[in-house]
Swiss-Prot record:
Native organism taxonomy: Archaea, Methanobacteriati, Methanobacteriota, Stenosarchaea group, Methanomicrobia
EC number: 3.6.1.1
Subunit annotation: Homodimer.
Natural source organism: Methanothrix thermoacetophila (strain DSM 6194 / JCM 14653 / NBRC 101360 / PT) (Methanosaeta thermophila)
Annotated cofactor note: Binds 2 manganese ions per subunit.
UniProt-recorded name of the protein: Manganese-dependent inorganic pyrophosphatase
Residues the entry annotates as binding Mn(2+) 2: D16, D75, H97, D149
Length: 311
């Protein structure tokens, strides 16, 4: 319907992005706004499919073009990460936990941004604030969002509020967070059927570092050895994407969630390489720099890159 209000997350949707759209649309519905519907800005990943199937929730509609649509943005606030033609949409609200980006609106809107580990944490608190009871299914989705985005609380983005929220939500949905989180990780780590392109673009975001156009992707696995056979294919795909996406550099975080480390694959211009090496205090060897204790793109990869390229 033309009058629908779409709650939508970022492109290359992850579990927090998709479940936040569903749970926030549900909250709006409970508050009497029946024209609010959840949407996804692309195909959902294996982990999210697992979560939705587990809690018997239908996947949201896919929204590819925001022209003339009424939208509420969740889990992002940057044009490069949003549905196409987002600046031709009527943006009504933004709920997010990332740095303030470049999306602009023609009027004041409700903008809720908090330094927590997941948008799901914010939305759970909004149910409470509005006195709306959380169903077992919605509790499960929000718990999954937090576990996914904080990598089972291991990420430096994780806060006490995230942990306390999961504790509350787990009681409502009746699931053990650690057990459920490990099942989610298994679903996310299953890369057998994934192509190099799937791996690169499965969780891919674009950034502008003082004029340096960059793409930063991430794939989380339980063992980096699983990715070794596809490494050259992935690098070839990254080089191809440099041209097709008109970027100066691409970084792909190959993250081992068990060892809590990331192999940062790099392709890009000589100037971008210099900035990348400066950001991570090392030399690129075989197209990568390996970093212990690096799990979070938001907190451990983007800030050093921004700083390195700052003019």
């Amino acid at each position: 319907m033309a009058d629908n209000i779409y709650v939508v997350g970022h492109k290359s949707p992850d579990t927090d992005s998709v479940t936040s759209a569903i749970t926030y649309a549900n909250l709006k519905n409970q508050l009497g706004m029946k024209d609010v519907v959840p949407a996804a800005a692309g195909e959902i990943n294996n982990e999210t499919k697992y979560v939705l199937e587990y809690f018997k929730i239908a996947p949201p509609v896919v929204l590819n073009d925001a022209t003339d649509k009424k939208v509420i943005l969740v889990d992002h606030n940057e044009v490069g990460q949003a549905v196409d033609n987002i600046m031709k949409a009527d943006i009504l609200e933004i709920i997010d936990h990332h740095k303030i980006g470049d999306i602009q609106t023609g009027k004041p809107i409700f903008f809720h941004n908090e330094p927590v580990g997941a948008t799901g944490t914010i939305i759970a608190s909004m149910y409470e604030l509005n006195g709306v009871a959380i169903s077992k299914e919605m509790a499960g989705l929000m718990m999954a969002a937090i576990l996914s985005d904080t990598v089972l609380f291991k990420s430096p983005t994780c806060t006490d509020k995230d942990k306390a929220t999961v504790e509350k939500l787990s009681k409502i949905c009746g699931e053990d967070p650690q057990k459920f989180g490990m099942e989610m990780l298994k679903a996310k780590s299953d890369i057998k059927s994934k192509t190099a392109k799937d791996i690169l673009f499965g969780d891919f975001k674009k950034f502008d570092f003082s004029g340096v156009k960059a793409g930063v992707g991430q794939i989380e696995v339980m063992d980096l050895a699983d990715l070794a056979p596809k490494r050259e294919e992935i690098l070839a795909e990254m080089r191809k994407a440099l041209e097709s996406e008109k970027l100066d550099m691409i970084v792909l975080m190959l993250t081992d969630v068990i060892k809590e480390a990331s192999d940062l694959l790099f392709v890009g211009t000589a100037a971008a390489k210099e900035g990348f090496e400066k950001a991570f205090g090392g030399k690129v060897t075989n197209n990568s720099i390996y970093k212990e204790k690096v799990l979070s793109r938001k907190k451990q990869v983007i800030p050093p890159l921004e700083s390195a390229f700052k003019k």
